[in-house]
């Protein structure tokens, strides 16, 4: 087969860019954990001053800055020999309470390397890997990365996109957050709507313990957390049942949907927040799809297969989710309420 040299060079250029990104992943964690990004966000600084202020070694910091500058993650002023973050870079790299927490996502990347041997075995055998078997950096990373998205969207756009839900929350609603993890979404809803009662459920005991700590630290008293499976949690007559970035991970998403239908009031709402995906594979072959397929093959699919589930994956798409919730779960109404580049927000009603 003849080789097209121009196409070869084009592919190699892409591969080198990806290799550079991969080599930089651990350095993202370095910048985050050692406070380098936060210090850079304060204004232009030399490598020596950055090292001094962060208690790090200048030679390592200088090399780190070179990597970050080459990747377009920091700015370099050659005339003054100093480094800085643009406002946009600072928002994404140095503001954990902002709308994007990119370093948090790299904790998820870190977890995939901790699980590499298991992933190799899963590919060979078709076995799965329970959520709780992952390194704790996965739980920390998903909390950080998803919390930023919830802070940016949940109160201002996602909940208002649901029919009549905000009014119920303001008056006082009974809410279930199923698969709540560390409780970021549950605490945010409880804090915003003090008349409502929010219960977070998760089958991962360590996550429930952390969620309780987060609620206590936030001083929120109208939220509680219970260790429970998504097909057997207690409670009924909920006004709102929410699934944030988790339904596709479930071992029995149809059973989960049926249980939600039983636990919901007749005029209640189920909100399903899922990774953004189109229904056809070819329409997901883009940068966001690449991230999602990567996470799905190493985290989401194994979690479902560990429980003999259908392995919907993080690119399930609206059509497949409709089959699960409506055909399987018994809901009568289902629609896309809103979306972001990273999420689908789906609404189901009896």
Model feature map: region roles:
Residues 174, 268-269:
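Short glycine-centered segments of the SAM/dcSAM-binding site in methyltransferase folds
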Residues 254-266:
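A short glycine-rich, Lys/Arg-flanked "PGG" loop and its adjoining helix->strand segment in the class I
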Residues 49-53:
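A short acidic, leucine-rich amphipathic alpha-helix
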Residues 2, 6, 14-33, 38-39, ...:
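Conserved Class I S-adenosyl-L-methionine-dependent methyltransferase catalytic core
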Residues 113-248, 253-255:
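Conserved adenosyl
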Residues 329-350:
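Core SAM-dependent methyltransferase catalytic element
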Residues 273-326:
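C-terminal alpha-helical "lid/dimerization" subdomain adjacent to the S-adenosyl-L-methionine
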């Amino acid at each position: 087969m003849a080789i097209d040299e121009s196409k070869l060079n084009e592919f190699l250029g892409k591969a080198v860019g990806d290799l550079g990104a991969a080599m930089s992943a651990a350095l993202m964690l370095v910048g985050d954990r050692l406070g380098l990004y936060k210090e850079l966000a304060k204004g232009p600084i030399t490598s020596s001053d950055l090292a001094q202020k962060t208690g790090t070694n200048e030679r390592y910091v200088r090399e780190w800055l070179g990597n970050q500058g080459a990747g377009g993650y920091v700015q370099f002023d050659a005339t003054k020999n100093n480094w800085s973050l643009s406002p946009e870079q600072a928002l994404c790299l140095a503001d954990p309470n902002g709308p994007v927490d990119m370093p948090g996502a790299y904790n998820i990347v870190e977890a995939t390397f901790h699980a590499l041997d298991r992933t190799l075995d899963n590919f060979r055998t078709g076995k799965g890997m329970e959520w709780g078997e992952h390194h704790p950096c996965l739980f920390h990373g998903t909390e950080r990365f998803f919390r930023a998205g919830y802070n940016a969207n949940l109160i201002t756009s996602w909940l208002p996109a649901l029919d009549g839900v905000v009014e119920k929350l303001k008056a006082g609603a009974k809410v279930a957050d199923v698969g709540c993890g560390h409780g970021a979404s549950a605490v945010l809803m409880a804090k915003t709507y003090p008349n409502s009662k929010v219960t977070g459920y998760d089958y991962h005991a360590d996550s429930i313990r952390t969620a309780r700590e987060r609620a206590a630290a936030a001083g929120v008293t109208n939220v509680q957390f219970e260790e429970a499976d998504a097909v057997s949690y207690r409670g009924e007559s909920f006004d709102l049942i929410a699934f944030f970035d988790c339904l596709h991970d479930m071992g029995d998403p149809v059973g989960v949907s049926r249980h939600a239908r039983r636990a919901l009031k007749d005029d209640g709402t189920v909100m399903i927040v899922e990774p953004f995906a189109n229904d056809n594979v070819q329409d997901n072959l883009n940068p966001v799809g690449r991230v999602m397929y990567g996470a799905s093959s190493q985290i989401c699919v194994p979690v479902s297969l560990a429980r003999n589930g259908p392995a919907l994956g993080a690119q399930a798409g609206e059509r497949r989710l409709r089959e699960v919730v409506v055909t399987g779960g018994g809901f009568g109404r289902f629609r896309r309420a809103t979306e972001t580049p990273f999420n689908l927000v789906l609404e189901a009603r009896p």
